Amino acid sequence: MSMSGSDFGAPCDDPKIFRNICRDRILKDLLQPDKDKETKSSWKVLIMDKFTVRIMAYACKMAEITDAGISLVEDLFKRREPMPSMDAIYFLQPLKENVIMLLSDMSGRCPLYRKAYIFFSSPIPKELVSYIKNDSSVIPRIGALREMNLEFFAIDMQGFTTDHDMAFTDLYSAQHNSKKFNDTISTMATRIATTFASLKEFPCVRYRAPKGTDPMTTPKFDMVPKWLATAVWDIVSKYKSTIPEFPQKETCELLIVDRPIDQIAPVIHEWTYDAMCHDLLEMDGQKYIYEVSKAGSEPERKEALLEDHDPLWVELRHIHIADASERLYDKMNNFVSKNKAAQLHSRDGGEISTKDLQKIVQALPQYGEQVEKLTLHIEIAGKINKFIREYGLRDIGQVEQDLVFGDAAAKEVISILRSKQDMSPENKLRLLIIYAIVYPEKFEGDKGEKLMQLAKLPHDEMDAINSLRYLVGSDTKKASRPGGFSLKFDAQKKKNAARTERQDGDETWALSRFFPLIEELIEKLSKGALPLNEYPSMSEPSSTEQGSTQSAAATKPAQAQPMSRRSRRTPTWAKSRNSDDSQSSDSSVLRHGSNDFKRLGNRIFVFMIGGATRSELRTVHKLTMKLKREIVLGSSSIDDPPQFISKLKMLTAGGANDV
């Protein structure tokens, strides 16, 4: 029996994609520092600290590390056996405690390894270089001492984080710690800059301008994008003289924004497969834990990584859960129809179950891995659809999106709170947060408390609403800038819409109208239509920069977004299989599109301070196909709704909500 690639998803691997460039730097520049002199027997030991091991884990597979000549991976701070006949590669953060351990390994009469190739993840301070040079016994044993400038987590083919999970609270809290504030800005800027050092890209840096014009009255947190942009610009500008072959003119664009510009995206129910996995299932990062039934014994607990090395995941992650479910059903039926052994294990030709598929795995070991993946995703999709029904998410999602597009107001919110008595407290709060963003006047005075009582939510849940007010402030002039913050507390009372209907939206599936604000920003940036007064540049864009019409665009007055027109609701949950779906899969662009990026346009980087969302990660993949430019999303972290809401509450917990 022959199997087509489409049955299980097609693998995608293109060296020009962002994360693959990071992987290649590690495999070639770091793990094979002396490759011209090496033989097949030149095995080395790789030693890392707790941070760099995570950089490595996101960028490479263990098999790739082994293929690069690494026989053993060790923890810097764990006791290690001496291997004086082998060379060691150290990949470390430039911290004093790391350097002390390194010198302890390599100094004295009996070093642990023959020679040390030392790579630091970011620029090493001069005092640490001097500290190394002062140990005369170590110097002859150093084969290389380099700065890799690779201090970020490549969490996605087109996404990275700087590992600042608490940046939202550290930078935006009403009771922030000044030292922690400054340290966070500094380390975040350094790690962002290393992405450009790794890719040898010199960015034109733009940022969300402060709402206030008076530095004396502008809240400190409102200056965060500007301060971060300044710090990044200072670092990358120095690369022109410190990194060989680093560009002298801008080769790409970096837009720095922050979470307050779009607080709907982190709380609204997103209906794509990836987002629903992280919203509804118990996930540990990209790790999904599940149980497999075993005949005559206890269920076996297993773990699965939902990431780019799983071709089915790549195909399904950014499409609607209903579409993903249909595709999985079709793949399963297609597999069974092509295989007689599989037909024997199905139930009288009826609908095949996951248990049937497990029997097929045993009967057809040659297809074990593929069928196991298919079984896994069928189980995941089944769980998600079960939760959608049990939690009544279709009705909740409809009200959420109608609020966002101006098609619902108090009547619909009150109605669903009264009719759905079994709605979870978390979903009630998410709905009320969206309501507060679109209709802030409904939470003035004691109105918010009354809504909380109607929803039967505890008083302390108001911390989330108070934080929204705190982030926007009470100055109407501050909150009314076109294209800026969508939340307008104390603004004129009128029917609001937080989004304007898009002509290119996918109406095939219900609940597909919502899009993150960065989608509009990226499109405007790509066209050179992003106003410079709202998103200033750290420098005048060079003539070689893609979208050189920005200067002209800056002279045009910014147009306020029109109010949303009432749109036709998508009446059905399902679509016909032959209808077009513009978000069907990103695998084709990953396989074939990168040559087009190089030919048609420079990269665009967007950095979201305070945590990005799954929908924003999906957006950069979608726009990469649409704009024919590789879009890379960076952030301090990737947050799912519960994480964001917890952080939101912390901003003003205890009533510290003075602006």
Curated annotation (Swiss-Prot):
Gene Ontology terms for molecular function: syntaxin binding
Highest classification ranks of the organism: Eukaryota, Viridiplantae, Streptophyta, Embryophyta, Tracheophyta
UniProt keyword list: Protein transport, Transport
Listed Pfam families: Sec1
Region of interest (Disordered), ranges: 476-503, 533-593
Keyword Protein transport (UniProt): yes
Domain of life: Eukaryota
Disulfide bridges in this chain: none
GO cellular component terms attached to this protein's record: plasma membrane; secretory granule
Family note: Belongs to the STXBP/unc-18/SEC1 family.
Name used for this protein in its record: Probable protein transport Sec1b
Main function: Involved in the vesicle trafficking. Binds syntaxins.
Biological processes, Gene Ontology terms: intracellular protein transport; vesicle docking involved in exocytosis; vesicle-mediated transport
Biased composition (Polar residues): 539-553
Biased composition (Basic and acidic residues): 490-503
Keyword Protein transport among UniProt keywords: yes
